Regions:
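Alpha-helical transmembrane segments of multi-pass membrane proteins
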Residues: 7-26, 160
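Membrane-proximal helix-loop-helix units in multi-pass membrane proteins
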Residues: 87-138
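Interfacial helix-start motif at the membrane-water boundary
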Residues: 34-54
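Perimembrane loop-to-helix junctions flanking transmembrane segments
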Residues: 26-40, 176
Length: 216
């Protein structure tokens, strides 16, 4: 329940900010983090990130309760994902075309850590799921979505190349080359799909475990 509520409260502010930014920010060239420059954008982005972190932590708790070892790489990677979300919420991004500040650098590397960690965690879980009867139905879906998320994550990182080589000279240098906003939205779509698959798989696995274990 906590995971579902967390994911819901993460998605709703994003939907609102996308609608509120129509005509002001480009979904192709501006990242989701740029919504901080909208009215109440910072608060809504923080709500979305914290809710996603809470939902992910609740999902991890269920996953650990049905067969995945505690303290292993999956738990570490999920923790990196959640910590990255919180850091990205606390440290805002820099305006497009400006020089990188310390908070902006923290935001960027927090994003790098979280976008690498979750697809890798999903892939490791899919390997683990193939060995478990309770999770067997989710293994293939989680594996494929993890690979898609990893591929789109690489695309998102590559989309920042024009920004790196712009040397802070302004938006006009980058005109026609910025697609990191589109890449990030595709990435978040694949990540939400991965988290949804894990959530459904966890629900099924928990039910199977309860059916096997007799009531006292």
């Amino acid at each position: 329940v906590v995971a579902v509520v967390g994911f819901l409260f993460s998605a709703l502010p994003m939907i609102y900010l996308h609608l509120a930014s129509i005509g002001r920010l480009s979904p192709v060239s501006h990242t989701i983090s740029d919504y901080i420059f909208l009215t109440h954008g910072g608060e809504l982005l923080a709500l979305s990130a914290v809710s996603l972190a809470v939902g992910s932590a609740a999902l991890l708790r269920v996953i650990l309760a049905v067969g995945v070892p505690r303290g292993g790489p999956v738990q570490v990677l999920f923790s990196v994902w959640c910590l990255g979300l919180l850091l990205a919420a606390v440290f805002p991004t820099d305006p497009l075309g400006s020089e990188t500040s310390l908070p902006g650098a923290v935001h960027r590397y927090a994003g790098l850590a979280m976008f690498v960690s979750l697809p890798l965690a999903g892939f490791l879980l899919s390997v683990r799921f193939r060995e478990s009867l309770a999770w067997s139905g989710a293994a293939i879906v989680v594996r494929r979505l993890s690979m898609v998320s990893a591929a789109v994550s690489v695309l998102f990182l590559l989309s920042h190349v024009p920004i790196v080589f712009s040397n802070g000279k302004g938006d006009e240098v980058l005109s026609g080359f910025l697609v990191q906003g589109l890449a990030e939205r595709l990435l978040f779509g694949s990540i939400f799909a991965l988290l949804g698959a894990l959530l459904l798989g966890a629900r099924t696995a928990l039910r199977r475990v309860e059916e096997v274990v007799p009531c006292p």
